[in-house]
């Protein structure tokens, strides 16, 4: 299929059968129209209304019930890595050395309970990420690139589950190396507060993941606010 020549709008794009495709005679679908939206609730509503035939996302609060009763709901593997990116030029790192900023980012990362996010938010059997390279990538020699992850030197994504207190204490140690102080209760001192903003679009899954991270960081007194915006604003903010 190829573009039908019309301008792609903010909410849809249309493709038509390409007569120059080498096997065009076997193409039976003459036109494809795609709904463009970052709002999974709107996408799911359009599917239920019969406005679209296929969707690849649903609101997270619908997943559990769909698994049990809807034969049209399928979970399939896909290569990908969900990640949170830092703006290293933000005020958060303004007075820090590169080494101190790295300590801060590591502390934030190890405090995130990835297993909780998978079980309670994503709910589709994802694996916790411990590098940018996703699971399932070939190694070029007929094998899988990532196997015994921790033994290969990768970050242990289950550390926060297997040794919560030890992992939290490591996060405190990293933040102390970056100049932050803690009280006797293990919480950040009011002398050296940490506040940061988490930017996401309005999809329910992204917001809920942000809320889970917000709760994890609050465990030692880090204040993270969640800023929701539509997709176009989100892209501009990230530039």
Description of each model-found segment:
Residues 43-44, 104-105, 234-238:
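Short, hydrophobic alpha-helical packing/hinge segments within bilobed ligand-binding/sensory domains
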Residues 15-65, 214, 223-225, 230:
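Ligand-site clamp/hinge motif
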Residues 20, 48, 52, 67-68, ...:
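Sec-exported extracytoplasmic/periplasmic mature domains
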Residues 16-22, 79-104, 111, 120:
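A bilobed periplasmic-binding-protein/Venus flytrap-type ligand-binding module shared by bacterial periplasmic
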Residues 7-11, 161-168, 178-239:
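Ligand/substrate-recognition segments at binding pockets and active sites
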């Amino acid at each position: 299929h190829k573009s039908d020549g019309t301008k792609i709008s903010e909410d849809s794009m249309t493709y038509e059968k390409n007569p120059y495709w080498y096997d065009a005679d076997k193409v039976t679908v003459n036109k494809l129209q795609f709904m463009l939206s970052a709002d999974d609730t709107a996408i799911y509503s359009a599917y239920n209304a019969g406005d679209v035939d296929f969707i690849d996302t649903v609101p997270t609060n619908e997943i559990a019930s769909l698994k049990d009763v809807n034969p049209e709901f399928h979970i399939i593997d896909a290569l990908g890595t969900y990640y949170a990116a830092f703006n290293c030029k933000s005020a958060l790192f303004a007075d820090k050395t590169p080494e101190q900023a790295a300590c801060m980012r590591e502390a934030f990362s190890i405090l995130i309970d990835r297993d909780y996010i998978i079980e309670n938010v994503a709910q589709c059997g994802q694996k916790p990420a411990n590098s940018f390279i996703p699971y399932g990538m070939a190694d070029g020699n007929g094998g899988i690139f990532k196997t015994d992850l921790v033994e290969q030197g990768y970050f242990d994504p289950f550390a926060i589950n297997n040794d919560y207190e030890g992992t939290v204490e490591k996060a405190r140690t990293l933040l102390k190396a970056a100049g932050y102080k803690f009280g006797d209760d293990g919480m950040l001192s009011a002398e050296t507060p940490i506040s940061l903003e988490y930017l996401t679009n309005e999809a329910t899954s992204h917001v809920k993941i942000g809320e889970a991270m917000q709760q994890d960081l609050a465990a030692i007194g880090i204040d993270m606010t969640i800023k929701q915006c539509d997709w176009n604003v989100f892209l501009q903010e990230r530039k």
